[in-house]
Amino acid sequence: MFTGDGFWHNGVVSYIGMVIILLQTPIFFNQQYPSLVDIAQRWQLVWDKDAAFELRFDQNCLSLHKRDEPKLDGISVDFVSGAVAHRRKFGGGRGQSIAKAVGLKQGVTPTVVDGTAGLGRDAFVLASLGCKVIMVERHPVVAALLEDGLRRAYEDAEIGEWMRDLMSLFHGSSISALADAAQSSGTEIDVVYLDPMYPHREKSALVKKEMRVFQTLVGADLDADGLLAPAMALATKRVVVKRPDYAEDLDGVKPSMVIATKKNRFDVYVKSAMK
């Protein structure tokens, strides 16, 4: 069982866990704003006047901006309003493909580790359907955005109570976190969900904006194939891998079943029945 800096406590997550990443990340921000200074210190971010990215804190929201593309809107994590809130209310509930992939059904609501959290959208969908979700994110800037999104969601009158119960964040290497958790006798995780970054062919404005920003910020997930083995060791029921429809199988391993959508697919690696 993980305690302290780990993300396990009695088999579930009850707080935001964080480990210190020794490699400091350069970022630009207004040093006159104490809130930004505090965020930088917490996430081991180093002020750099020549950094490619800027963090801003406006209207109680942390956002990331690509400095050489000032016309791009900032990227932030918002679980309270916008597209994710609309999907929570009108997205199809447990009939959604992602819900089927993780094994959600009547009487079964799995505990899920999202090993590649990103902006937390898929994790939020699962949490809104009742799953307890632990998000793992290794990049400190992305983790800072996630933490800020969680903070605002926890404070929200409509969703705050269940968000505090069901969604939490762990900052660290996904491969190491999954491998370490798999060796813990107190760990009980039904499903590990993975969505490694993969080059997109779509040309929509949203994809272009986010992929341009994220690929510049974090780079490609060159070690993505290394996620499958520790994920399989940790999950008691199944591992779900979200892939573009044209992508090869993760680590070259054929899934037990595939749930296809219009643009993506969910490769499901079954270990035991959901019950």
From Swiss-Prot:
Chemical reaction(s) catalysed: guanosine(1516) in 16S rRNA + S-adenosyl-L-methionine = N(2)-methylguanosine(1516) in 16S rRNA + S-adenosyl-L-homocysteine + H(+)
Any GO CC annotation of this UniProt entry: cytoplasm
Any Pfam family matching the protein: SAM_MT
This protein's record includes keyword Methyltransferase: yes
Record carries keyword Methyltransferase: yes
Keywords (A to Z) from UniProt: Cytoplasm, Methyltransferase, rRNA processing, S-adenosyl-L-methionine, Transferase
EC number, as in UniProt: 2.1.1.242
Lineage: superkingdom: Bacteria
Residues that bind S-adenosyl-L-methionine: 121-122, 137-138, 173-174, 195
Compartment(s) where it occurs, according to its Swiss-Prot or TrEMBL record: Cytoplasm
GO molecular function annotation: rRNA (guanine-N2-)-methyltransferase activity
Main location: cytoplasm
UniProt record similarity statement: Belongs to the methyltransferase superfamily. RsmJ family.
The protein's role, per its UniProt record: Specifically methylates the guanosine in position 1516 of 16S rRNA.
Name assigned to this protein: Ribosomal RNA small subunit methyltransferase J
Organism this protein belongs to: Shewanella frigidimarina (strain NCIMB 400)
